[in-house]
Swiss-Prot record:
The gene is CYP99A1. Keywords: Heme, Iron, Membrane, Metal-binding, Monooxygenase, Oxidoreductase. Pfam families: p450 (PF00067). It comes from Sorghum bicolor. Heme binds at C453. This is Cytochrome P450 CYP99A1.
Length: 519
């Protein structure tokens, strides 16, 4: 897609950036660039977050790039991130237009990509009050309990109790743990959002959105060459996914409406969807609380995609790091088993506050592998100063959260998986102080400011219980005699950062229980 865009760009136009008239401040420094395509060659890699970190080390924490026809500024230091995400939050609170959001998210009618304004404020307030606040998350404890126990049963089944994991000759049972945690995450999010389990059909649309949601489609880089995405078939693929999504949601909405008519009252069994249908008003104005059927679809996809992709990817990365660090695995398992032994499964989530080291493991996993390494892009709404440089109106602003969390200036041994860095007795007060609220800008896996991910409490509750139960019920080993240092850690980056290949592991039960008999 990038090659096609470049060829047509060379044949069609010459784009030059004109300096702001009367500007006394200088543009941020940046690397060399070519006519027409600007700095795109610097990002011709499967690891754009790494390439941007390396460029920032040469050119500074506030760096200018010309991406095709788009001006972009990359933020790579906590001080600059604070300026953008907190000090001048409203200036950078909107999103640039992206092809994926225009098509799959119904013209950016969701919460993540909606333009900053009254409609976005209404959507955020609605999602927080009805699904994502701490009280609502606690109420969903039974859902998390049920689905994470189902995950344990699926591991058993996949490993050999009917799932074919153990071969005819008694080979070690290998399970695709990545696929299983993805299914668990989708089940939790689906039941919370729709009141029912979701099938893989929605995940197929999520995969399309993640793959093309990075903002590097031809039309996103060369707005005047929007037709390139038509010629290459990308627009058709996105519309095919959108029609598939419409069919899925039309069926789900019809089922929910039928139940409501039959019961003649809200029962709470339809999850967040039931609330949205109650306040639906296809003729109302969004700013006054009216919400259309189309907007409901966009919000639902936002919740399903965000809640599923982030939690499952994080769980898979955390388990990967633990497999590479056996001493951390042993320490976390000892803590989990000490806290959960003798407790009924229904009491497991109530013991999470005792799992301080396991929570450090989760925090460290999110430091090394933020699911959104470049967060979601922002758009500068008025010309302003960042780090002593001018950022002009309309500039796309990219915050490299991955680089912030691996800065050697802020972190000791930043490339090492070391959960102990967050302990009170580790001697690193800066690391101990970090949390998930986005107030320490060297650690912002969920972003910061007005556009911070509102689902962090929801996602963390599911993630921590999922990891704790995987550590409690099973011992894990690598297949085929693989050594920890040989584990594949390759990534693929679209709008999120996934493992290139799902994690495959060999489980063995910690103790024989009604859940783990069969391996």
């Amino acid at each position: 897609r990038l090659i096609s865009a470049v060829i047509l760009a060379v044949c069609s136009l010459i784009s030059r950036r004109k300096p702001s008239p009367g500007s006394k401040k200088k543009r941020p420094p940046g690397p060399w660039r070519l006519p027409l395509i600007g700095n795109l060659l610097h990002l011709a890699t499967s690891q754009p977050h790494v390439a941007l970190r390396d460029l920032a080390m040469k050119h500074g924490p506030v760096m200018y790039l010309r991406l095709g026809q788009v001006d972009a500024v990359v933020i790579s230091s906590p001080a600059a991130a604070q300026e953008v995400l907190r000090d001048k939050d409203t200036t950078f609170a909107s999103r640039p237009s992206l092809l994926v959001a225009d098509i799959i998210l119904y013209g950016s009618m969701d919460m993540s990509f909606a333009p900053y304004g009254g409609n976005w404020r209404m959507l955020r307030k609605l999602c927080m009050s009805e699904l994502l606040n701490t009280h609502k998350v606690r109420q969903l404890a039974a859902v998390r309990d049920s689905e994470t126990l189902s995950l344990v049963r699926k591991v058993v089944y996949a490993a050999g109790a009917g799932g074919g994991g153990r071969g005819q000759r008694g080979e070690a049972p290998v399970v695709n743990l990545g696929r299983l945690v993805l299914s668990c995450s989708m089940a939790i999010t689906g039941r919370a959002t729709l009141g029912k389990l979701c099938g893989d059909e929605i995940m197929s649309v999520v995969d399309v959105a993640v793959l093309y949601g990075s903002g590097f489609c031809a039309g996103d880089l060369f707005p005047s060459l929007w037709f390139v995405d038509v010629v290459t078939g990308l627009t058709r693929r996105l519309w095919t996914a959108r029609r598939r999504l419409d069919a899925i949601f039309d069926r789900i909405l019809a089922e929910c409406e039928a139940r409501q008519r039959q019961e003649e009252k809200m029962t709470g069994d339809d999850g967040f969807l039931g609330v949205l249908l109650r306040i639906r008003d296809d003729d109302g104005e969004p700013e006054t609380g009216g919400i259309s059927t189309t907007s409901i679809k966009a919000i639902l996809f936002d919740m399903l995609a965000g809640g599923t992709e982030t939690t499952s990817s994080a769980a898979e990365w955390i388990m990967s790091e633990l497999m590479r660090k056996p001493e951390a695995m042993a320490k976390a398992q000892a803590e989990v088993r000490g806290a959960l032994d003798g407790k009924s499964p229904e009491d497991h989530e109530g013991q999470m506050d005792k799992l301080s080291y396991t929570r450090m493991v989760v925090k460290e996993g999110l430091r090394l592998h933020p699911v959104l390494p470049l967060l979601l892009p922002r758009s500068c709404q008025e010309t302003c100063d960042v780090g002593g440089f001018e950022v002009t109106k309309g500039t796309k602003v990219i915050v490299n959260a991955w680089a912030l969390a691996r800065s050697p200036e802020r972190w000791h041994d930043p490339e090492e998986f070391r959960p102990e860095r967050f302990a009170d007795d580790d001697g690193s007060s800066a690391a101990v102080a970090v949390d998930y609220r986005g107030s320490q800008f060297e650690y912002i896996p969920f972003g910061s400011g007005r556009r911070m991910c509102p689902g962090n409490t929801f996602g963390l509750a599911a993630l921590e219980l999922m990891v704790a139960r995987l550590l409690y019920y099973f011992d894990w080993s690598l297949p085929d005699g693989m050594r920890p240092e040989e584990l594949d850690m390759d990534t693929v980056v679209g709008s999120t950062m996934r493992r290139r290949n799902h994690l495959h592991l060999v489980p063995s039960p910690y103790k024989e229980t009604e859940l783990t008999v069969g391996i």
